[in-house]
Amino acid sequence: MHRYRSHTCGELRASDVGTDVRLSGWLHNRRDLGGILFIDLRDHYGITQLVARPGTAAAAVLDKLSKETVVRVDGKVVSRGTENINPDLPTGEIEIEAAEVEVLGAAAPLPFTINTDDGVNEERRLEYRFLDLRRERMHRNIMLRSAVIASIRSKMVALGFNEMATPILTATSPEGARDFVVPSRLNPGKFYALPQAPQQFKQLLMISGFDRYFQIAPCFRDEDARADRSPGEFYQLDVEMSFVEQEDVFQPIERLMTELFTEFGNGREVTSPFPRIPFRESMLKYGNDKPDLRAKLELVDITDVFEGSEFKAFAGKHVRALPVPDTAAQPRKFFDGLGDYAVSLGAKGLAWVRVGEDGALTGPIAKFLTEENVKVLTERLGLAAGHAVFFGAGEFDEVSKIMSGVRVEAAKRAGQFEENVFRFCWIVDFPMYEKDEETGKIDFSHNPFSMPQGGMKDLEEKDPLDILAWQYDIVCNGIELSSGAIRNHEPEVMLKAFEIAGYEAETVEREFAGMLRAFRLGAPPHGGIAPGVDRIVMLLADEPNIRETIAFPLNGNAQDLMMGAPTVLEEARLRELNIALRKPVETKAADAKPVAEAVHPDAAR
């Protein structure tokens, strides 16, 4: 028999009754019923119940052991009997009569329990992450991640893509996020950077003559944590394709996402094909560029209705209406509750009216609406008896942010929100440029390296604020999974694009010398995308925080509490690297912006 096990703890069934077996695992739980010990033994594969009778050698050993001790147990498979079957366990029809027990790894008192998923402080969990990962939910999440990545690889190869590796040590990037830098011992005073993404390398692979590239790429960015963003490092499905237009990129990625979320979605519906929603339309209808389409409500821009109005709360402001059917009969606390929610998002309040059976509008602002206002709103919003309408007014960005949140919350409270579904969409037609409201200067709105939709002609002839870019996002349930773009591979078009944003040609030539040199030696049209693996798994696992899908994440302050990183280097190490440390000083943001201050081309915004 094998030194440690003949079977796993998730393997034995009723057909194995009478078999002598050897199991190894962790003591998950124990119960003492009249001197008879019942032990749940757990390994990676499952749980098997052990029984140790009073007076046996096995009972003498097991009685002294604490939870999470690692043991090897020899015994015989016996039936539990019909009345004692545990239907929640695949091994629930049998148990092991323990005959011999060997302690393989003793466990000291635990900092928290493993066999329950009670609320333990996240910092504590991260400090003892190896214990946290023994918990069923966390173990399941990490195994889901493993299966998802394996499936992605298989599907990408089937779609004709080739997996290629790109460097981890590279040059510092002029793009928006901060780099993690690595000193070079062999080149004193010089530094490598860990890649924010393989962006330039994957484009160079296309220029090298390869056609369909992918990798599960580690990316490193020194940025703050969010619920859907882990500080330090993350992984993305990095993709690039040659001789493609926008729809050529959409086709394989949409197929991949549909198959992947169908495979791992536990029966949740996956909506396909994915709708294409222009950026401007998304901002007006949903209040943001990552709409949660499970909310079956849409905002309506009614700014023009109140132009010149005497109603000061709306006059001269951007005004958005949210019609909600079948809510007029809701009690006042329903309306007040949504108002409180809007205030939590930064609003001063939330105006509303409801439509009675006679079609008349009632509510706090009804008296301020003229007959013409009521007529236009009824027609434009499709109002009918039972409807309620919520209003937001303010600066465009402000009212968009607030009403996007109100839209989703109202849908949830009014029964207009779909459960158990993955609703994907593509956001397209991003503006190439935007105006800084304070300085009046034109700058890139998102990705400075994408191709303008009209090429050089649009750059030379159109108002910059009217130029659209071949940029796109893929969004699922309000989570942005990735940005992507058709790349600007023509040097003169790129220089012109940067010129419009106020960058001198020699600055661009200096900062992007390597890419421009490659573009001038025969570059094909190419484009790509990079969906975040962590966010994909977060959605599939239905977890609210991305750190729940990563085996060993940093905490919100970019610290590894388990390994004690970052650490202080000894003076000898610093000397070897020719590094002298200075005391930290408070710094102010530099007046001059870096070149291409926008986020990385395929970064989730």
Residue ranges and their predicted role:
Residues 1-605:
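Class II aminoacyl-tRNA synthetase catalytic cores and aaRS-like
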